Amino acid sequence: MSTIDLIKNVTKREERPVYPFTAIVGQEEMKLALILNVIDPDIGGVMIMGDRGTGKSTTIRALVDLLPEIEVVTNDPFNSDPRDPDLMSDEVREKINNKQEVPTIKTKIKIVDLPLGATEDRVCGTIDIERALNEGVKAFEPGLLAKANRGILYVDEVNLLDDHLVDILLDSAASGWNTVEREGISVRHPAKFILVGSGNPEEGELRPQLLDRFGMHAEIRTVKDPDLRVKIVEERSSFDENPQVFRKAYEQSQEDVKSQIIQARKNLANVQMDRELRIKVSQICSELDVDGLRGDLVINRAAKALAAFEGRDKVLPKDILKIITLCLRHRLRKDPLESIDSGSKVESKFYEVFGLLEEN
């Protein structure tokens, strides 16, 4: 066995078990936002803001066990999809066009971490100019965006990340492609990923124009109920003492949610949303003075994803109610004189437009 294989095996054995997603108590808003983005990546990612120590990173990393498998081209640094031209590299597309055989394997969707101090080259990848000039080849060293293609890119403390890098991430997530240009040489590759950011609002907010680019915005608050706090602490202690036994207890519930997600991804295209509901969604966005049409689009997508997750082929008003705050709270203009928070404002407008009585 080679030294590299030995290191890989040791690393694999030392990998810390992940806390089960279904064992996380509370924080339903954050969990729902993550699941819906896995069902429909076109929702546009999620920004999770909340107090320190509320389980933001734990929940995001716990998602890895629920992610379905995808088919990728073997030994391809971009996780190319052998069937979708928008998700394959130029090299793979050329092989397919030339009727060459392209071997594939099944692999789990990956979560890629973007460190806070990452440089633009580390994120986007680099071109070896010397090799390009001397040998006439596009020697490209892929970055994190290549690794994240068809997966999830997680940025902790995204509000502390350089604005320029946030722009690059959002542009790539929206367009699905990353282009690197150096000294007149250009390389592009697919970079379609779900962008998940988390942060503490005390450490600074994202600029509104960047915030608007995230499909959803979840707000996480510290649990106040003493009984619930005790339960969370006890569960965490049990996991730390014996992760394998703890994970075993949640095996079935994990498998159930994973199956639900896989089925929802398959059925998503069949979910219908009545025109009347779409008109009411746009009316809410209009009356709340939401800039642009991103809000309307994301609500429609998220409502369909929720209906698919719950095993239905038709969107109901309750689906819209459940996701509308996640989709709009970060798109409202902030008025320092208003005492009502943006989430409550969105819900009140929903009840007003749909002609329903507010739930106490």
Swiss-Prot record:
CDD domains for the chain: AAA
Activity regulation information from UniProt: Redox regulation; active in reducing conditions, inactive in oxidizing conditions. Thioredoxins f and m mediate the reversible reductive activation of oxidized CHLI.
Any one GO cellular component localisation term in the record: chloroplast
Keyword check for Nucleotide-binding: yes
GO MF annotation, one: ATP binding
EC number: 6.6.1.1
InterPro entries found in the cross-reference section: AAA+_ATPase, CHLI-like, ChlI/MoxR_AAA_lid, Mg_chelatase_ATPase-isu, Mg_chelatse_chII-like_cat_dom, P-loop_NTPase
Pathway given in the UniProt record: Porphyrin-containing compound metabolism; chlorophyll biosynthesis
Entry binding sites for ATP: G50, D51, R52, G53, T54, G55, K56, S57
UniProt entry keywords in alphabetical sequence: ATP-binding, Chlorophyll biosynthesis, Chloroplast, Disulfide bond, Ligase, Nucleotide-binding, Photosynthesis, Plastid
Lineage: superkingdom: Eukaryota
Enzyme class: ligase
Disulfide bonds: C285-C327
Reactions that this protein is recorded to catalyse: protoporphyrin IX + Mg(2+) + ATP + H2O = Mg-protoporphyrin IX + ADP + phosphate + 3 H(+)
Protein's cellular compartments: Plastid, Chloroplast
Pfam annotation, one family: Mg_chelatase
One GO BP annotation of this record: photosynthesis
Quaternary state and interactors: The magnesium chelatase complex is a heterotrimer consisting of subunits CHLI, CHLD and CHLH.
Function: Involved in chlorophyll biosynthesis. Catalyzes the insertion of magnesium ion into protoporphyrin IX to yield Mg-protoporphyrin IX. The magnesium-chelatase is a complex of three subunits, CHLI, CHLD and CHLH. The reaction takes place in two steps, with an ATP-dependent activation followed by an ATP-dependent chelation step.
Family recorded in the similarity comment: Belongs to the Mg-chelatase subunits D/I family.
Protein name: Magnesium-chelatase subunit ChlI
